[in-house]
């Protein structure tokens, strides 16, 4: 009834997102789109308390309040519809869909809504926010508007990813994030850079702080029939790599506990040069438990290469053997999931990963959704794509420094020589994928490129949503077997 009245009287100027329509307490809420952008419309006798609106019109006895999509109005929506507030994933199998543009969540909803995976629709790292100029509030609000637009009400999480500093942790907690991924990589030691003498000296320093040798030496474990025991050498090496990192994680955990009572806590130890051995995995878990750190997810450094935006590079059979060991350790200790970072496009490993973990997993993606967005640009606005491509070439060497990739610029095609209809095919080239993947910040800092990129995606919204949704669903289907 309300939508019909609205369309009859205002339909020419507004496109209604019908899936967004909700009713509560004699009020109707829905999203519309006009030439200037998206607008929240609230229909009822009077506006809800706290709602700000720029226009009020009546039709057939119904008052329509036209509102900006801002934080204050979203807070009003959250009061009426608590499912628009993020919640914990807990030990449910979960999937993170980072959105660097802030407009991609409707596609992510479509990919995940009928799956058995709990969605983390709001997920960005500190690094991503710095490069895109966004805040924790922007990330959570943008995702929530997308959830509202699609009429999704089954619950979602919000992950403050790769947090290193206490101030970033606190600000994300105060914005309502429900998951926090701690990156202690600045405190992880690289064993290959230490001589035997240096290793022994630094281990003695640790022992002067705490006699962990008395806790671990001689401790034995059996994992899938393999005997694992702490001896002086492997305990020394485990402590050298992880002891300080775990102390940092503990400090961050205590700060977070003072801010919010209930949250998912992910510990990321994947930023090491060498893969996490079963014994190192055991040491990390034992130390976290000993300190009272309650963690939901643990991200390990697996064998092989986990580069951004492309499939796994490595020995699949060896990975399968290792993930079975790690999954068994997780089952042995109980109470946490194994998390896969740089999870975008790792299609070849998903079946083995999901099977070994028995559904006790979390997978993170982010860059792949941005790649699909730029791919849509290549389909519908070839000249803009060529400008973006040239921008990525100009900034690649600087932007690549903080990413683990192997892209070779000598192997990327000259975009001027590629026909318009062949541009989308460039996204099959791993060098092009990584070129575009890591330079998003430089592209989005170019005001002209950013404005035209967003305008093009808005003008081709359904193609954009369906392209991203199809790609993310490919991940989901392989994880669900």
Swiss-Prot record:
Its cofactor is a divalent metal cation. A divalent metal cation binds at residues 162, 308, 341. It catalyses: keto-D-tagaturonate = keto-D-fructuronate. It is an enzyme of class 5 (isomerase). Keywords: Isomerase, Metal-binding. It holds the Pfam family UxaE. Its EC number is 5.1.2.7. InterPro entries: UxaE. One of its GO terms (molecular function) is racemase and epimerase activity, acting on hydroxy acids and derivatives. Catalyzes the epimerization of D-tagaturonate (D-TagA) to D-fructuronate (D-FruA). This is Tagaturonate/fructuronate epimerase. It comes from Thermotoga maritima (strain ATCC 43589 / DSM 3109 / JCM 10099 / NBRC 100826 / MSB8). The gene is uxaE.
């Amino acid at each position: 009834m309300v939508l019909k009245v609205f369309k009859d009287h205002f339909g020419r100027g507004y496109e209604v997102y019908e899936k967004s329509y909700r009713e509560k307490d004699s009020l109707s809420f829905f999203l519309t789109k006009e030439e200037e952008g998206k607008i929240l419309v609230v229909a009822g006798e009077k506006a809800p308390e706290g709602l700000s609106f720029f226009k009020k019109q009546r039709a057939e006895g119904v008052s329509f309040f036209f509102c900006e999509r801002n934080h204050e109005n979203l807070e009003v929506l959250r009061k009426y519809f608590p499912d628009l507030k993020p919640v914990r994933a807990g030990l449910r199998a979960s999937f993170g869909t980072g959105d660097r543009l802030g407009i991609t969540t409707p596609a992510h909803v479509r990919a995940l809504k009928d799956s058995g995976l709990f969605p983390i629709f709001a997920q960005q790292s500190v690094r991503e926010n710095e490069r895109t100029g966004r805040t924790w509030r922007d990330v959570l609000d943008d995702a929530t508007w997308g959830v509202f637009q699609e009429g999704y009400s089954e619950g979602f999480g919000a992950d403050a990813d790769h947090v290193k500093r206490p101030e970033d942790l606190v600000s994300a907690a105060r914005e309502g994030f429900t998951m926090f991924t701690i990156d202690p990589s600045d405190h992880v030691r690289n064993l290959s850079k230490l001589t035997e003498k240096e290793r022994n000296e630094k281990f003695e320093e640790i022992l002067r702080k705490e006699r962990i040798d008395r806790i671990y030496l001689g401790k034995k474990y059996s994992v899938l029939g393999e005997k694992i025991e702490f001896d002086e050498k492997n305990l020394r090496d485990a402590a050298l790599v992880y002891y300080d990192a775990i102390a940092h994680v503990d400090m961050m955990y205590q700060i977070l506990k003072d801010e919010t009572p209930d949250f998912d806590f992910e510990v990321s130890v994947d930023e090491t040069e060498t893969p996490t051995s079963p014994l190192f995995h055991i040491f990390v878990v034992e130390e976290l438990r000993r300190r009272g750190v309650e963690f939901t997810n643990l991200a390990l450094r697996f064998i092989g290469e986990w580069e951004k935006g492309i499939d796994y590079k490595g020995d699949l059979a060896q990975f399968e053997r290792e993930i079975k060991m790690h999954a068994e350790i997780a089952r042995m200790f109980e109470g946490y999931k194994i998390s896969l970072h740089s999870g975008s496009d790792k299609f070849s490993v998903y079946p083995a990963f999901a099977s070994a973990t028995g559904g006790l997993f979390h997978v993170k993606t982010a860059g792949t959704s941005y790649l699909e967005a730029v791919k849509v640009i290549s389909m519908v606005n070839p000249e803009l794509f060529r400008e973006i491509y040239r921008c990525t070439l100009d900034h690649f060497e600087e932007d690549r420094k903080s990413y683990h990739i192997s892209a070779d610029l000598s192997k990327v095609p000259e975009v001027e020589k590629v026909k318009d209809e062949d541009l989308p095919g460039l996204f099959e080239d791993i060098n092009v994928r990584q070129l575009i993947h890591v330079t998003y910040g430089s592209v989005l800092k170019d005001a002209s490129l950013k404005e035209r990129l967003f305008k093009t995606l808005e003008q081709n919204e359904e193609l954009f949503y369906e392209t991203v949704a199809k790609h993310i669903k490919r991940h989901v289907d392989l994880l669900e077997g």
